[in-house]
Amino acid sequence: MSSTLERARTAVATSPELRRLVERGRAILLGPSDEALRQEQDESHWQPAVAAGSRWWQAALSALSGVVGATVIAASAPRWRLAVPSWRLSIPGIAQPGNSTQSTMWFLLGLILIGLGWLGLVYRAGRIADPRRAVVVVGAVIALWAIPVSLGPPLLSNDVYSYVAQGEMASRGIDPSSVGPVELGRNDFTSGADPVWRSAPAPYGPVAVMAARSAVELAGHDQVAAINFYRLIVWIGVVMAAIGIGMIAVGNGLSAAVAIAIGIGNPIMILHIIGGVHNDAIMFGFLALGLAAAQRDKKKLAVALIAAATAVKLPAAVGLLYLGWCWRGAIATWKERVVTTVAVFASSIAAIVVGCFFVGLGPGWITALTSTGKVNDTYSPTTKLGFSIAEILNGVGLDVNGQLLASGVRALGLLATAAIAFVMLMRSPRVGYIKATGVMLVAYVLLGPVIWPWYLVTGFALLAACGLGRYRPSYLVVCLAASWFVWPTSVVSMGTVGSGYQHLRGLGVVVLVITLAWGAQRFAARWERRYHGLSTTEREAAVSSELAEVDSTC
């Protein structure tokens, strides 16, 4: 046996092809080499040079663009047709329109303005010399953008009506994980809940249900007031997330202002998380603070915070997995890693069970997660691919069950997600549990059965706090594109517009986004190869000479 191993080692050592193959396999499973990690770290830690002048007008212009865009979207957003109309869910002095076409056109204009403002904010955040001042400026601009979308009706989603209905159920002693809001009978809470979820149990944990119950009870069981109280809870979650992302970025030697601008100031966060009043903000806040605490070696506090995030939405549990695996550092044995991971999960499960008992929540919220996978009109690549193949086959005369085919492709996507989870588990001692958590959250969303824009925020923001490096252009493109995936037509996915070959057209949109991200990446790489390392004066001179050459040839 030993002689066979020796011959294998000799063959690998003497064959460049075999050596490259072994190194590639090792990099896939265990991560890049120390030299590659140092190179990636240098690229991730690169920050743009601070401009000589303050140029506050650029920051002001970005802030103005974003606030105008947010105001346009909030002022033109239609009310949820099944909710009881109330002036308390509108911008004072502005009547909410009922025309979805008009709302959509204003939405597109507003989204362009917010997108431009966001890109400008990211650009300026890295060019303010004082780090503390940069964080204050970025935080103030994001808060300014969030105010208009917090005054109008809930944007681009009706989920908050279901949240407060579940909170009303919990306040009456009804378990929202076993029955849907229809159990409340006829009232404002039931009528406001989306018919899709009116009979469905809540797929949210005890912390989410307790937050909804608190909002309802503070509001005196008034539906509209409960929504506004829930908005306040979402704001608290966003602030927690911003603090956590900033702390993680500083711990990684990066600019907190840039990380917050990218991860918290993006259009998805402003329009979908804050404007749509999603409980993902609560999960995000606890998870970001927990990972930041672990980074500062406060691991028991980290487990408590990440367990709280898991008690909002179950996907946050990946943070527990990678934290437990990396608990004892890079030189721990497999046995030590398994023991600490089991201990982390056991303590977290015990805490969540106690929370469920306190709130009066059964285990149905875990099994209720499968109900979200029944939605087919999202931009999940696996869902679109399965239904698109069925549409093509049906178009040529073959009778194919699209739902069955899509289920098969979704299963393959989940298998790929499990494979990525294992690879990141092996890599996590080298790349870090924070980056591993971010990668896994993004992979789970992209390969899962359902994608809504607000699902992407948490993973993307964690990656931004770890340093996007050369991947920043594709990140910005995907984040901007995902903001367009839902239109304000109470609520209509962009893929449902028009008729015929709906899923095939949706798959085309996904392919277009991937192509644009790839193109932005290639363009930025070319630009970096040509101009990176030059001083500002040299870079401007190089660009000017190229423009002069173009003018001379025209």
Residue ranges and their predicted role:
Residues 66, 115-122, 225-252, 418-424:
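Transmembrane-helix motifs of polytopic, lipid-linked glycan transferases
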Residues 110, 208, 212-219, 230-244, ...:
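Transmembrane alpha-helices of multi-pass, membrane-embedded glycan-processing enzymes
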Residues 3-6, 11-22, 34, 43, ...:
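Transmembrane helical bundles and short interhelical boundary loops of multi-pass, membrane-embedded
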Residues 232-236, 257-287, 293, 312:
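Multi-pass, polyprenyl lipid-linked donor-dependent membrane glycosyltransferases
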Residues 133-137, 245-266:
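Transmembrane-helix signature of polytopic, membrane-embedded enzymes
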